Amino acid sequence: MKILVINSGSSSIKFKFYDLKIQKCLASGMIEQIGDEVSHSKIETCDGKTIEENMEIRTHDEGIVILNRYLKETGVLTDLKEIDGVGHRIVQGADYFEGPALVDDDVITKIEELIPLAPLHNPAHLSGIRSSLRHAPCLPNVVVFDNTFYHNIPDYAYMYALPYKFYEKYRVRKFGAHGISHEFVTKKGADFLGIDYKNFCVISLHIGSGSSISATKDGICIDTSMGLTPLEGLMMSTRCGSVDPAIIPYMKRVAGYLSEDIDTIMNKKSGLLGITGTSDFRKVLERMHKGDERAKLAFDMLTYQIVKIIGSYYAILPRVDAIIWTAGIGENSAELRESVSKRLAHFGVGVDETVNVNCIKKPTDISSQNATIKTLVIPTDEEYSIAKATERILLSLKK
């Protein structure tokens, strides 16, 4: 099957086009800064053909038109009918969906209903879906949700100790995020180690501009660090992570902030950016190596928070077969992996310094010789997961 995967963000469209029959990504690209006077668009094919342009792209609909044009101009396909289906990443499906779903009016309505839970993401996802349906109405579209991996988390783990009516009326509970990535790397990790996924106990770390940690027991996720929104949990590039909620009324009272101001600060002006002035972890490391105390503080805060969550998940799992690092920082920062691992030595965690530093873009065991818990680095591939999930839905329709 040939599957087009679309990740439609608030001002961007990222895409990959797969031929799953030969297990190959034929093309990938992005359309950025949608709505700006000058937008950027690019496609690159597996055989090296590239188109890159700067122009005004006012809407996601115009972006989808450009995407379709690029697929034809690069020779990846001659007609959109060659595509078997389109898969869309959806951040928030709440408890409406237990897995991927074929797009119909009911699915669209439910994604719309969940906009209050994901006001930045779900409207953009809907724009991508509607544009895809408008320009290629003959193609089936499938939605793959970022939080269905957490569908089996027990109620005592996903509930907040707030009035129960908050949950009943407003769906206030933990939903999590990055589930597509966590599911991909945990399955990949079990396969890499030769362990049956249904007997695999693992702590997975998706550490990037957004970061989350999940605990998976016997192939079922039992807890994750993000909550009702992606703000909860670890400090991130621009998000504060978990803080005392009383900070909000306190800052309103003593500094005159509005709720909207604090929401923006906590999501877009905190985390690494709030502590150091930069959201780029690479620059944080550079500054730390030059003696910048704020950069060192941010690094130590992140290390501490990761260690603390791993420790709490170690306590709720019957055992830990592996710790898996993934995503932009997790895959590329040997220094952070080493710092965290040293603080977990009493659990039996350790990394081989040489292998850790020379880790390349493939699943790698970086454990030290004496470690009793495996430490793996596994590059995530959310788009491939979405493509495979889309394929499964489409094949089920043919039965």
UniProtKB/Swiss-Prot annotation:
Pfam families: Acetate_kinase. Its EC number is 2.7.2.1. ATP binds at residues 14, 206-210, 280-282, 328-332. Mg(2+) binds at residues 7, 382. GO terms for molecular function: acetate kinase activity; ATP binding; magnesium ion binding. Mg(2+). Can also accept Mn(2+). The active site is at residue 146. Substrate binds at residue 89. Catalyzes the formation of acetyl phosphate from acetate and ATP. Can also catalyze the reverse reaction. This is Acetate kinase. It comes from Campylobacter hominis (strain ATCC BAA-381 / DSM 21671 / CCUG 45161 / LMG 19568 / NCTC 13146 / CH001A). The lineage of its organism: Bacteria, Pseudomonadati, Campylobacterota, Epsilonproteobacteria, Campylobacterales.
